[in-house]
């Protein structure tokens, strides 16, 4: 560790000075990283992967300290599961870094180069954002994943993980630094905030002189705090209230398959369906069968009055159910008159993450694509496909429901920006 990152300060002023030092160093190193060759970045990524594998036993031992402390603090089973690191998860981190190394490097890519009437050529070059601050909870694998994406996209990064994972994150960060040095890049290209003092988050959010973008990954309370306090632009999504609308022009077999997969393939993820909308004309044919399938999988249905009429064991929905991201085997179900009401419901209650229509009607599909204002809009496909890997982006640092700077899954390209380049041969403006 550097002298700066080895400090574990106490008190708000000391914490602010510590984080300011990390941010200043990140800005310096970011300039070096922005001009690093692709081969050097890939060497470092592969070296980090190897360091993680070589240190697997040590990582698991450090993680054991976090798990013991978490259990003593009363973390529940799901929280401890997210916190855990075993041999398989170490291998997954290493594989992920190798996959990032294999991805095309977006930095330096030139597009749209055209001649202007004056004779100059004008185009755009893709360049790193600069310094990225990443604030996250629980999952230690984010330390490796985020570092890998920032490195490949030419960005320096400052990582602030949850206090419950501090031992795990320190151990992973040590492997990252070792790999960076082995690859011939500055170890401070990736810096971990090692204090668990909550004031460090506020200090990072105020470091707008050095940090270009903030990416929060965690629960709603964390993201709301980041958005409220940050002086720096934020890439984020608050909720994943994803909808599937079964149109009365849907193929019933497709509708059943998509509705079951979108909800039950994995519950605790932001691209799982939370509300099912069904056109009134097809509801009697599809809802009773779907309800039986959900019942077999242990999913609780909370429905509108018409849903409860068609599915007698359905729990009556409250208004709050339409605005809830359950991340659990609970599904809100509403029967709507048709496409107009479905789109209106999504506009009123959706989170702008991912919404899908099941229909064989081309016109309705086109209208749904055009009018639903979400980061991902789908036709005849499960919302679970809203993922950087599935979109061909490789790994992702998160999903953005904002419209600026990035929208949808944020991969390597989303961690870059573009600048104009102009090529001339002694041209002057007349």
Curated annotation (Swiss-Prot):
GO process terms (BP): L-proline biosynthetic process
UniProt pathway annotation: Amino-acid biosynthesis; L-proline biosynthesis; L-glutamate 5-semialdehyde from L-glutamate: step 2/2
Organism: Methylococcus capsulatus (strain ATCC 33009 / NCIMB 11132 / Bath)
Function of the protein: Catalyzes the NADPH-dependent reduction of L-glutamate 5-phosphate into L-glutamate 5-semialdehyde and phosphate. The product spontaneously undergoes cyclization to form 1-pyrroline-5-carboxylate.
Record family assignment: Belongs to the gamma-glutamyl phosphate reductase family.
Disulfide bridge map: none
Domain of life of the source: Bacteria
PROSITE patterns per record: PROA (PS01223)
Annotated GO MF terms: glutamate-5-semialdehyde dehydrogenase activity; NADP binding
Name of the protein this chain belongs to: Gamma-glutamyl phosphate reductase
Keywords noted in UniProt: Amino-acid biosynthesis, Cytoplasm, NADP, Oxidoreductase, Proline biosynthesis
Pfam annotation, one family: Aldedh
Main localization category: cytoplasm
Compartments it resides in: Cytoplasm
GO annotation, cellular component aspect: cytoplasm
PANTHER family cross-referenced by the UniProt entry: DELTA-1-PYRROLINE-5-CARBOXYLATE SYNTHASE, GLUTAMATE SEMIALDEHYDE DEHYDROGENASE
Catalysed reactions, as listed in the record: L-glutamate 5-semialdehyde + phosphate + NADP(+) = L-glutamyl 5-phosphate + NADPH + H(+)
EC number: 1.2.1.41
């Amino acid at each position: 560790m550097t002298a700066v990152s080895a400090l574990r300060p106490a008190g708000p002023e000391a914490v602010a000075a510590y984080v300011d030092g990390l941010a200043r160093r990140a800005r310096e190193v970011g300039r070096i990283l922005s001009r690093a060759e692709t081969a050097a970045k890939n060497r470092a990524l592969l070296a980090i992967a190897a360091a993680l594998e070589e240190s697997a036993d040590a990582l698991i031992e450090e993680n054991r300290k976090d798990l013991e402390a978490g259990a003593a603090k009363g973390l529940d089973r799901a929280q401890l599961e997210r916190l855990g690191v075993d041999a398989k998860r170490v291998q997954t981190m290493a594989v992920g870094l190798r996959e990032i190394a294999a991805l095309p490097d977006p930095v330096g890519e030139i597009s749209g180069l055209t001649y202007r009437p004056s004779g100059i050529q004008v185009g755009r070059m893709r360049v790193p954002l600069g310094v990225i601050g990443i604030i996250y909870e629980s999952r230690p694998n984010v330390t490796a994943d985020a570092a890998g994406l920032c490195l490949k996209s030419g960005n320096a990064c400052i990582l602030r993980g949850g206090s419950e994972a501090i031992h795990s994150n320190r151990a992973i960060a040590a492997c990252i630094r070792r790999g960076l040095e082995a690859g011939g890049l500055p170890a401070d290209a990736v810096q971990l905030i090692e204090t668990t003092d909550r004031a460090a988050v506020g200090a990072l959010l105020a470091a707008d002189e050095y940090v270009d973008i903030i990416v929060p990954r965690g629960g709603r309370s964390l993201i709301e705090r980041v958005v409220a306090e940050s002086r720096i632009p934020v890439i984020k999504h608050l909720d994943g209230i994803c909808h599937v609308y079964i149109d009365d022009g849907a193929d019933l077999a497709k509708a059943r398959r998509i509705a079951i997969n979108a909800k039950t393939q994995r519950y605790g993820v932001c691209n799982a369906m939370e509300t099912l909308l069904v056109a009134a004309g097809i509801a009697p044919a599809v809802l009773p069968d779907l309800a039986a399938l959900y019942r077999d999988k242990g999913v609780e249905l909370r429905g509108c009055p018409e849903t409860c009429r068609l599915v007698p064991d359905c729990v009556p929905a409250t208004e709050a159910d339409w605005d809830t991201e359950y991340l659990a085997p609970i599904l809100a179900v509403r029967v709507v008159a048709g496409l107009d009401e479905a789109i209106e419901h999504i506009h009123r209650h959706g989170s702008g993450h991912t919404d899908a229509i099941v229909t064989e009607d081309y016109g309705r599909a086109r209208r749904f694509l055009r009018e639903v204002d979400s980061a991902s809009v789908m036709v005849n496909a499960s919302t679970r496909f809203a993922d950087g890997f599935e979109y061909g982006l490789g790994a992702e640092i998160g999903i953005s429901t904002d419209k600026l700077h990035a929208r949808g899954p944020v991969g390597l390209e989303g961690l870059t920006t573009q600048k104009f380049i102009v090529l001339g041969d002694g041209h002057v403006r007349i």
